[in-house]
Amino acid sequence: MAPSVEGAGVALEVVERGSGPSVLLVHGIASDAQALAPIAETLSAHARAIAYDRRGYGGSGAPEPYQGTTVEEQAEDAAALLRALDAAPALVCGDGFGALIALDLCKRHRALVSSAVLSNPPLFMFVPEATEQLAAQRAEIEEAVRAGGPQAGVDAWLGGRVEGEALERAKAAHRAFFADYAGLASWPASRRELRALDVPAVVLTGPWSPPHVVAAAEALAELLPAARRATDGDLAAAAQRLIDRD
């Protein structure tokens, strides 16, 4: 069993590799620390790579009943973890929902963050054209839940992107998935606040990123004063460039 640290009221299972500057890897919806293991392994050659299961996923705890969360609550978990591990300031790499958590750390816990990789950030408040895609996605998930239960809803959201053991882990964590999904739009941030975030950052998408996610990434990169865009989808490479920069 991996060691755990206390988050904001829940125990979080943590996996560490390597030594050097701290890198915190924050997974997205329907994922876990195991999914980030290849990235952590790559980064551990030159850094202290820290991955953890967010609340409700993998070996981490969650309140009972676990029916909802917010970006800010998740960021409090991450902040508590960084303090408990004496790992700040850290390069924070967040994917999907994890990118919003990284942004909130930059906004409210600036001293804990040295730089950030924001991969596929679902910051759709600045992308009006995303409304149609998000509505269709919600309808598909709801139909899947009616037909096959909550695990089928997770499967529908993943849309074949994940298979095998990773898919089974995601479906087993369906409570955390739906808590996350409900919290996607929970982050209160204005253009003015984002323009004030001076954290060196890479806003990352890949060739496979959906158009509305790419649009969100473009909008975010234009607002963050110290951000640059990358479109190769290589989170480890983006993180390594920031490590080398420091």
List each model region and its residues.
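Conserved alpha/beta-hydrolase "acid-adjacent" motif
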Residues: 210-216
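Conserved acidic catalytic loop of the alpha/beta-hydrolase fold
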Residues: 72-90
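Conserved hydrolase catalytic core segment
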Residues: 88-127
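Helix-rich cap/lid subdomain of alpha/beta-hydrolase
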Residues: 121-168, 173, 178-185
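Catalytic active-site module of serine/aspartate enzymes centered on a nucleophile-bearing elbow/loop
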Residues: 225-246
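Conserved HGGG/HGGXW glycine-rich cap/lid loop of the alpha/beta-hydrolase fold
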Residues: 6-63, 81
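Serine-hydrolase catalytic core
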Residues: 189-198, 220-221
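Short beta-strand/loop motif that positions the catalytic acidic residue
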Residues: 197, 203-205
